[in-house]
Amino acid sequence: MRAAAEQFARKPYSLVNLDDVVAAVDISRGAMYFHFPSKQALATAVIDEAHKLGHEAVAGVLANKLSGLETLIDLSYLVAVLDTGEDLARAGLYLLESIGRVEGLEARSLGEVIDALAQIARRAVDEGDIAEGRDPEDIARLLVSTYIGIRHTGDLDNPQQFLMHIEKAWTLLMPGFANPERMRYLSQFVRRRTAMASGKVLPQRGPA
């Protein structure tokens, strides 16, 4: 699975050859095809493993029991750290885009993420960090869309720059929905999270 994730993280789906995966793990083609009869079957398995990785990591953030908006901020940095440093996480997101439209997998997955973030945003409204009258689902959809956009326009192989894009996004977005009285603290919190995440990511990587 690790070899497959590396291939899917570094190449477009259409350019990944199962022979490359077989060569990387030194197994026979027969053994590979016994477990994964097609490239799509292997890709689907990678998506499933990436989902498990993400679920475990998110559970760790939720266990910190921070405020709702702090949790949303932490989750964005968590995803960025995984995306820039873990081939499995990166491959899972790439594959959701490339094959996830088949049978609506991408739409369902993103819908589940938006629903989960909306629940956290709703808590942030109750706690006073998000201003009254802001729709939690709208905020959740905005955050997901923003991350996807940064992912498309940024460079995942330049983690420090990518994290700065996340920080700038929060700086621009928060005035639109955060309680003005909390902006100073929240801005400081975002900067601290950038610094913490910067210590977790690998140096810039060149092309494979």
Give, region by region, the residue ranges found by the protein language model:
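Generic hydrophobic, amphipathic alpha-helix propensity
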Residues: 1-4, 21, 46-54, 117
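Helix-turn-helix
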Residues: 3, 7-41, 45
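Hydrophobic alpha-helical connector segments
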Residues: 45, 56-89, 136, 140
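Secondary-structure edge/capping motif, primarily at the C-terminal ends of alpha-helices
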Residues: 61, 90, 150, 154-157
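All-alpha amphipathic helical-bundle segments outside canonical DNA-binding/catalytic cores
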Residues: 70, 105-112, 126-142, 157-165
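Short secondary-structure transition hinges
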Residues: 77-133, 152
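Phosphate/oxyanion-binding loops and surfaces in catalytic or ligand/nucleic-acid-binding neighborhoods
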Residues: 78-82, 86, 146, 150-153, ...
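C-terminal peripheral helix-coil segments that are non-catalytic and often amphipathic
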Residues: 114-115, 119-123, 127, 156-208
